[in-house]
Each structure stands twice: as C-alpha cells, then as structure tokens.
C-alpha cells in the first residue's frame, strides 16, 4: 500500500505529463528542441486591469533620457516593454487566475518608476553650501570621533632623550 501511494504521489508531484524514456543523445536533443510551453501562456494581460501600458511616447522619452538615438522599430521596443511589465506584474501576483490587480502590484507601482521626470529634481550642491556644512560639522562620539584641541595633545606629550655613548 505504501509503495502505491508513494509512486502515485511522486507522479503527481514531479510532473503532470508522462515522458517516454529518452535513451540516446539524439532523442534528448529532439525532445529539448520541441517547445512544450510558451511564456505567452503565463503572460496573458488581464482584462479590466489597471496595468500601465507603455506607449510609444514613453519609449521615445526613455531613449532620449538614456542618450540613445530614436529607433526605426519603436513597435518592437514598445511590445517588449509591455511584455516585461506583464511579467513583472505576474511575479507579484500569487494567484495566476486573478483579473483584478493585487495590492502587492499597486504597492510596487508606487515604489518603482520608469522615468526620471517622475522624480523631484534636487537642488544642485554649490561650493558655499559645502563650506557651510564643513563649518557646522561637529564630532560625533557615536562614530568614535573625539573632540580635542592642540593643548590636549601637548599636555600628554612625552620626550625621548637619546644618550650619546
């Protein structure tokens, strides 16, 4: 009874398909050359979801920001980016059959951004700002920085006398 249960469990766990025994190198090559699944099966765009679409305008803006020239085939780049976005969203979904976007995906959209223009630019650091920061700098004992003056060093000084022989 144990052996039947074990073999049944093993068959269910290891694979839902049964393969014939592959004995030669040629049979293995032929088997691996056949496509048994496609990533498009996993990456079906859910209908009615609020998934952001990558538009050709976004592709042109990203190319401009990266310093690359405009591509002749923007359609393929747009399609590739849309597939990548679907794949990333698929990674954040626990249930593969969901139609509505998951809360994890929504949290992710708030953290990761594609375009630099979505971020607030910082004010450039100038020399006067650096000098002001240096003047306001104080030693921090938690970092092991100790405040001392030159008189503290002179007080604990020592002298080495050499004898001539």
From Swiss-Prot:
Catalytic activity: L-glutamyl-tRNA(Gln) + L-glutamine + ATP + H2O = L-glutaminyl-tRNA(Gln) + L-glutamate + ADP + phosphate + H(+)
Any one Gene Ontology BP term: mitochondrial translation
UniProt membrane topology term: Peripheral membrane protein
Broadest EC class assigned to this enzyme: ligase
Cystine bridges: none
InterPro entries: GatF (IPR027499)
Keywords associated with the record: ATP-binding, Ligase, Membrane, Mitochondrion, Mitochondrion inner membrane, Nucleotide-binding, Protein biosynthesis, Transit peptide
Keyword presence, Transcription: no
GO cellular component: glutamyl-tRNA(Gln) amidotransferase complex; mitochondrial inner membrane
Extent of the transit peptide: 1-19
EC number: 6.3.5.-
Family to which this protein belongs: Belongs to the GatF family.
Function: Allows the formation of correctly charged Gln-tRNA(Gln) through the transamidation of misacylated Glu-tRNA(Gln) in the mitochondria. The reaction takes place in the presence of glutamine and ATP through an activated gamma-phospho-Glu-tRNA(Gln). Required for proper protein synthesis within the mitochondrion.
Protein's name according to its UniProt entry: Glutamyl-tRNA(Gln) amidotransferase subunit F, mitochondrial
Species of origin: Candida albicans (strain WO-1)
Gene field: GTF1
